[in-house]
Amino acid sequence: STTKGLAAVCLLQLVEEGKVNLDDPVAKYWPEFAQNGKEKIPVRYLFCHKSGLCGVTTPLPNDAYYNWDIMVEALAAQKPQWEPGTRHGYHALTYGHLIGEMVRRVSGKTIGNYFNEKIAEPLNLDFWIGLPDDQFEKVTDIQPSFFPLWTRLLAPAFKIIPKGMLRGDLAMIKDFDDPSTIAGSAFNNPRMEIKNPFYANSREWRKAEIPAANGHGSARAIAKFYGVLSNGGERDGVHILDKKTI
């Protein structure tokens, strides 16, 4: 999720340049987004997890995160899960596609290419959104947590139990298996961990541009990036954002 901040700065640069207005409807830049009552959602709601699009309730193929068009088309068609602006809900993975599609619509570049050109290269950051082949040897595997996997495996067993009889974690486990729920749509659609709990070590995951979750880089690069933001938005003559934007 550290990648979310890097993705957000890409779109904020376009705001700073006057190419995007935070109070304009998203649909002004992304017309298909207006479906299902979303025509008035302002750009600023995408930044602060208030758009009501924390997940997709239509079941998605397991490899949907590796196909940008599938994800953004699903989000464009999705009905908000609450009235936009009235509630906050963590957009665990969709955050990156919402921000990233705005960047693509306005700049004409994928967010990975935009980030590399406008931020990573100027600051000499060893960080990527969508890992190139020649960087694979620098990446170490991660060890997955099996708790999320077990909750998903157990979820079908809870289908026969009325939800009102379950509390706390047990109710959450039941929701995980149902993409029509907020928890299920946000964290288990597509069902990647069922297919492969080691998916984050796969070639497909590393090469994909998933701006909310799969940036690859060094701790030094992350520290440098956020250090620039915390010290006014400029370093060594490289301008990232104005202080007022930060």
Place the predicted regions along the sequence by residue:
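Hydrophobic (often cysteine-bearing) scaffold residues that line and stabilize catalytic clefts
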Residues: 2-3, 7, 91, 95, ...
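Internal, well-ordered domain-core segments that constitute the primary functional module
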Residues: 58, 73, 86-104
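Generic alpha-helical structural context detector
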Residues: 44-48, 73, 224-227
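Short glycine/serine- and small hydrophobic-enriched flexible loop segments
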Residues: 12-17, 97-105, 224-231
